[in-house]
Each structure stands twice: as C-alpha cells, then as structure tokens.
C-alpha cells in the first residue's frame, strides 16, 4: 500500500484545497486539471505539457496583454503619448527590466532544475495566499540569477 502512495498527487490535492480556501480560481483550476490528467490516461500528455506549457502560457498571457491594442480600447494616440509621459517612460523601463528578468529566469530554471521546487512553492504560496498571479517563477528565477550570478 505504501509503495502506491503518490506524494505528487497529495501535493496537487493540497494545492487544490489551498486554491479553494483562498478563492483563487487560477490555482484551483490548474491543480484540478492536473489531478484529472494525472489520474487518467491523459497522463501520457505530461511530456508535451512540460515541454510546451510554459511557452503556451506566455503566448496566452501576451495575447491578453495585447488585446486592448487590437480591440482599440487603447488608442494609437495613447500609445504614442506613452513615449512622452514620465510615468509611462518609467513603466516602459520597468517592463524592459521584468522581461529581461523573465528571460534570465527561463535560462536559470533550465540550467539549474534544483531551484525549480523552491520557486514553485514560493509562487504557489504567493498566488494562493497573497492573491498574486502565477508569473512569479520566471521573475523570481531572474532575480535569483542576479543573486547567484548565473
């Protein structure tokens, strides 16, 4: 019986409960979907999800961020004004910094998989308890790369 104990499934169940208790739909849905995949024949798709899930998530996030431009909610005039407003210039600089950190984070997570568990725990805790969003592992890994010099 103990040989069939699946710690990873227990972790996903705990995350599901944390998501429900904190009323965080992202964590609840993600954990629920992964549990269903894990306990069904769909688990054969885990290698594909692991290989492409991050890129797909970034693609969906980018589509969401660019939608106000495509829909016209953010006018061309507003976009042009962003290059002359101090606040917008600072926002552009911060956006550049965060994108750079995310790139460093992807490289670090690929080259040092031993840090991934800690980054994921911190991110999930931040999402579940602090109402954050799950883009944290990339930025956290980017910040970590600055501290450890990678």
UniProtKB/Swiss-Prot annotation:
Chief location of this protein within or outside the cell: membrane
Subcellular location as annotated: Cell membrane
GO cellular component terms given for this protein: plasma membrane
Record-annotated membrane-spanning stretches: 1-21, 45-65, 83-103, 115-135
Highest taxon of source: Bacteria
Keywords: Cell membrane, Membrane, Transmembrane, Transmembrane helix
Pfam families: DUF441
Topology within the bilayer: Multi-pass membrane protein
Family as reported in the entry's similarity comment: Belongs to the UPF0756 family.
Protein known as: UPF0756 membrane protein ABSDF1616
Organism from which the protein derives: Acinetobacter baumannii (strain SDF)
